[in-house]
Curated annotation (Swiss-Prot):
GO terms for molecular function: flavin adenine dinucleotide binding. One of its GO terms (biological process) is tRNA methylation. The lineage of its organism: Bacteria, Pseudomonadati, Chlamydiota, Chlamydiia, Chlamydiales. FAD binds at G14, A15, G16, H17, A18, G19. The keyword Lipid metabolism does not apply. NAD(+) binds at residues 274-288. InterPro entries: FAD/NAD-bd_sf, GIDA_C_N, MnmG, MnmG-rel, MnmG-rel_CS, MnmG_C, MnmG_C_subdom, MnmG_C_subdom_sf. Keywords: Cytoplasm, FAD, Flavoprotein, NAD, tRNA processing. NAD-binding protein involved in the addition of a carboxymethylaminomethyl (cmnm) group at the wobble position (U34) of certain tRNAs, forming tRNA-cmnm(5)s(2)U34. This is tRNA uridine 5-carboxymethylaminomethyl modification enzyme MnmG. Homodimer. Heterotetramer of two MnmE and two MnmG subunits. The gene is mnmG. GO terms for cellular component: cytosol. Its main location: cytoplasm. The keyword Transferase does not apply.
Amino acid sequence: MWTFPVDYDVIVIGAGHAGCEAAYCAAKMGASVLLLTSNLDTIAKLSCNPAVGGIGKGHIVREIDALGGIMAEITDLSGIQFRILNQTKGPAVRAPRAQVDKQLYHIHMKRLLEQVPGLHIMQGTAEALLDNGEKVLGVSTKEGWAYLGKTVVLSSGTFMRGLIHIGTQNFSGGRLGDAASLGLSEDLKRLGFPLGRLKTGTPARLLASSIDFSVMEEQPGDHNVCFVHRNEMFVPTLPQVSCHITHTTDQTKDLITKNLHRSALYGGRIEGVGPRYCPSIEDKIVKFADKDRHHIFIEPEGLNTQEVYVNGLSTSMPFDVQYDIIRSVSGLENAIITRPAYAIEYDYVHGNVIFPSLESKLIEGLFLCGQINGTTGYEEAAAQGLIAGVNAVNKVLRRPPFVPSRQESYIGVMLDDLTTQVLDEPYRMFTSRAEHRLLLRQDNAGMRLSHYGHSLGLLSSERYAMFQEQKACIEQEKERLSKTFRKYGDTVVPLTRVLCRPEVSYQQLLTEFPADVRDLGPIVGASLEMEIKYSGYISRQQTLIRSMERSENISIPEDIDYHSISALSLEAREKLSKFTPRTIGSAARISGISVADIQVLMVSLKKDAH
């Protein structure tokens, strides 16, 4: 086997959303990087819905931007509709979402990656890892040659032993139209990695010209919404479009009920577990039998195509049943299908063999990110890619790993969950997963995390200065307004007290007291308003975090023998040995570990220290 004559610092396998972020961040940190993908024309392909962001997910994209990653930038360049979800709810759960042009997303990502110094993009299919039993050495390809590297980042998506299901038919594939990767699964088994099976699916695509939009509800976008942190208001570079909302009918329900046995999911042909919060239409009909109809969202796939994505109609039914189901939906009576819906099963690696840095516990220098870790979603994958790419470089440079905490970021919440919990379904981020979500708002991601991005070399000094200036402005104005007393109603109160009233906005305060309120602009002003309006809750959460941190960050030695601590419950000994947490906080979040177990563990650690 011929070996390529360059020894890379980092080899990234797979150019999906995790792989692109990993390769970009590693190269930006000065590493020599190989990004290996089976097809250069599918880099950053949006395999499912043509959208980025949403509840929890939008928060993650803003955090990626604050750290110096690229998903936010590519989304803003490719966006054809921008919205803020949960606008009527509290600030912690408001989140940006964008419809993107899927072809332009790929084009912008590929063009950007091609311009990064030190990043070599190469077409080739990874077949096996090269290792010496303890450490990764590189990768061999299906084409018959090898690449050597100090570290390897594996971001294989749904390609590891991918199996596509359309009714009773199934066939090998990483996604429709792309071959599966068979060798990597076998190689990971050889190295002792515990593998499981998960399932996801995607709906059919339809021709827009065959749809009756007149019977549907139009869903336009919002103004001044974006993912990249800015000082000025955002104006999209592309023409903006609307989505449309329709619904299933009684006929839809009857068709699915009558043909349920022909579904790959309900016919017993799928062993993998699917995402709870993105169910197929047959799943919804069965589990919510009392509902007569379900919403369907028609989402355009781009400006230069007639294809639309039918959000809410994912299925693994045979194609003839899909045809009838689609035409039973209001407005889709004459719809022309361009691509069928399908389900896909794939292999993933259990989280107990991965450190929060995303390095494997079994083979040194091997990092895993994206759906191989059991997650679902472009945003979760990209965030893991950033962490894996950064820590691969840290490994090469013999620096400590970078792992943001769950108290300061949604990315930290995800890393902690993936490495302490037993996944029984694909992991998706929600704001409800964070204990301190009022501190983790999408508007303050830059103020929370930009110092990390700057110190890692990912965030420019100019952008870091912008975040620092925003933070300073908010702190100074909070302080000034708290000391500025004016008559409001019958009493004289500080202006911070006025802004705490639910009916008073920052803009109203600015209008009513123009001589006393500094105009910070709508973006920074909105953050100031939230900081003041929710200051009581924020203060309580910060106090709680400080009290927890005293025990949260107590380190656990790598060589600890849990089975020798007889006072631990049997379940605790088994699970702590399986997950090998690095801190008391991580140990406490492993399912099945009780408060009593943690107390026993802390006593044991204190004894050993003495």
